[in-house]
Each structure stands twice: as structure tokens, then as C-alpha cells.
């Protein structure tokens, strides 16, 4: 009779998690690949408008203005209210996820806050001529850059990663 030996018991080598691993370096300038890698990234980066090398917030606001011009003839007040409300809720999630994945609490490349807030501004001033909308654009960008009063408070108070930070990204533009 031939005896079959059981294979020797080999302990499985499992790599222990590194507790104090440094976080990955922050993603200072997102790429198109990053924007397309997750739906939240695409939304938070304003369908790619936030990928601009210079003044991504301004480019995102211009994209919002263009989308407003396209959508405005097709939406009534209830439609705009729903779009802005849903855009805010989805944006909260998208900005939270994207900020965490980028490793930057409020990257200038995250422009969904400009998009939804500028839609609100344009909706509130409608009907408005092109020149009135241009003034609204200029004032919106000025107040976004300067951040005085309630905008400064929101910007200081709601920082960090997680839902609170995602909410803060949106709130300073609504203020």
C-alpha cells in the first residue's frame, strides 16, 4: 500500500495593513482620465470645464452660462427649481467624493458649486438681457473670488473631507 502524504501546511502570508501609511499625494491638477473615472468626478469637475489650466472657476461659470442658455427655453420655474435642487443634492455627493479622491478639501478645479449657484443667479434675474447676464457673471465671479461676509463664514466653517466639506464647497457659492 502506498500512503499519500498530505501537503505540508504552509502558512498564508497576508500582508498586514500599514496603520500609519501616509496619504497619497494630493492631485493638484486633475486630468480627463480622472474626470471620466467616476461619475462624481465628471459632475464635480463641471463636465470637464474644471480641467482648465487657468481660471477653472471662471471656465466652469461660463459653461454654466452656456448650459443655462441651452436649457432656459425648455424649463419653466418649476423645472429650474427641480434642476437646481437636484443639482445641489447630487453636487453635494459629487463634490464630497471628488475632494476626497483628489486629496484636496476644496480644489479650484471642483466647479459644480459655481455651476449650480450661477444657474440660481441667472434664474433669479430672468428675464434679463445679455448685458444684464454679463453683469451677473462679473459680479458672481468677483464675489466668489473676494469671499466677504457670509461667503467667508461658509468658506471657513465648512472645510475638510466628508459630507461637511462637500456641503461647504457648495455653500460658499450660494451665500
Tell what function each PLM region has:
Residues 2-10:
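Extreme N-terminal basic, low-complexity initiation segments
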Residues 11-61, 93-122, 141-175:
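Interhelical loop and helix-boundary elements at the membrane-water interface
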Residues 47-48, 68, 137-138:
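Extended, non-catalytic scaffold segments that flank or surround catalytic motifs
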Residues 52-53, 58-72, 79-80, 87, ...:
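Short Lys/Arg-rich amphipathic alpha-helical segments
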Residues 68-82, 121-134:
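Helix-coil boundary and interhelical linker segments in multi-pass alpha-helical membrane proteins
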Residues 70-85, 153-165:
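Membrane interface segments of multi-pass transport proteins and intramembrane proteases
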Residues 81-88, 132-143:
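Hydrophobic core segments of alpha-helical transmembrane domains in multi-pass membrane proteins
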